[in-house]
């Protein structure tokens, strides 16, 4: 059999290769010589960025090489924090409307996606410091005092803009987190506390979920959901009392039914939900939680596909911040053990306390799985609601505006 690559002959066909020489690769102009605009170093102001790595150990005549890595990693973090804040402000601006333009939802999704990717990078980037030995860190640690990552203004601004509640913060040396900042920084922090956080904006957005409430034309999602839950619980109770079950199995199934029923009652009863908010166990309002659940159940509908992505990215942001905090805790324990932090905190013990649900902004979204029901119990959408969720509310308006 002839080789399929030989064209029936003994020689290989002509191969396409990249030109490594010749006139084609030299056909261009040197715009720098012609004085066109700024050069790469000028545009990026590299003279400022690349000269900002001042090793304190070197200035003291005892240069420690790993101090350079330590500085670069933290400077890179601050640059990425700035980008996250920039993108977060764009997302917040798009959400900060009585009616969110649904044709802009993709821009919100893209902004959150970018934030997630940056946080993924930072989660891995901090582990680069693991290439530094604890003994090498000790050699230049004395030059850091009283500097501490706790003093990162951008990180605190980012937390506030996301929606970290002040009352949920772990105190730093039994003091308010703002006590380490000067007057100008305090003004910036106070501004972010007064602004609407991403959590607040998402809550308002979810409360307006289409089809959530009953109207004269449609029963609404929530009343149908309550009926479905009651049927689901009734079936669970019947399963527990099945005559074919042994008494031991019946006892176990009854206990499971009781726990499941209590869990559903905590969301079906608005008063119980409000009590959970007062206790600090939940953050989103009852209506916002109902809206999120509706999006979860009907995420395949065109109008809910991007909102579902938004909710997913919000949980990703929380997850990645938790992972970053955890990686930071492990790093500090490895480098310091039980020593006090350079800023005066308890070091590892303080940081470990921040790796908790207290710092999860969108904790309620994680807990939605508690109240999901099997697919066969999910309420059917009415024909009217199918139509509502198949077309963006302001799509027709946008198209008519463009035609004008």
UniProtKB/Swiss-Prot annotation:
Q: Pathway membership of this protein? A: Amino-acid degradation; L-tryptophan degradation via kynurenine pathway; L-kynurenine from L-tryptophan: step 1/2
**Any Pfam family:** Trp_dioxygenase
Keywords linked to the UniProt accession: Dioxygenase, Heme, Iron, Metal-binding, Oxidoreductase, Tryptophan catabolism
* Any one biological process term the GO annotation gives: L-tryptophan catabolic process to kynurenine
Q: How is the cofactor bound?
A: Binds 1 heme group per subunit.
Q: For this protein, what reaction is catalysed?
A: L-tryptophan + O2 = N-formyl-L-kynurenine
Q: Please name the top-level EC class of this enzyme.
A: oxidoreductase
The protein's required cofactor(s) are namely: heme
Q: Does the keyword Cytoplasm apply?
A: no
Residues the record lists as binding substrate: 70-74, 141, 342
* InterPro entries named in the record: Trp/Indoleamine_2_3_dOase-like, Trp_2_3_dOase
- On the tree of life, the source organism's domain of life is Eukaryota
Q: Identify a single GO molecular function assigned to this protein.
A: tryptophan 2,3-dioxygenase activity
Stated EC number for the protein is 1.13.11.11
Residues that coordinate or bind heme: 328
Q: What does this protein do?
A: Heme-dependent dioxygenase that catalyzes the oxidative cleavage of the L-tryptophan (L-Trp) pyrrole ring and converts L-tryptophan to N-formyl-L-kynurenine. Catalyzes the oxidative cleavage of the indole moiety. Involved in regulation of protein homeostasis, longevity and reproducive life span. Specifically regulates proteotoxicity due to age-related aggregation of proteins like alpha-synuclein, via its effects on tryptophan metabolism.
Q: Would you identify the family this protein belongs to, as annotated?
A: Belongs to the tryptophan 2,3-dioxygenase family.
Report the PANTHER family cross-referenced here. Answer: TRYPTOPHAN 2,3-DIOXYGENASE (PTHR10138:SF0)
Subunit organization: Homotetramer. Dimer of dimers.
Official protein name in the record: Tryptophan 2,3-dioxygenase
Q: What is the source species?
A: Caenorhabditis briggsae
Q: What is the lineage of its organism?
A: Eukaryota, Metazoa, Ecdysozoa, Nematoda, Chromadorea
Q: Which gene encodes it?
A: tdo-2
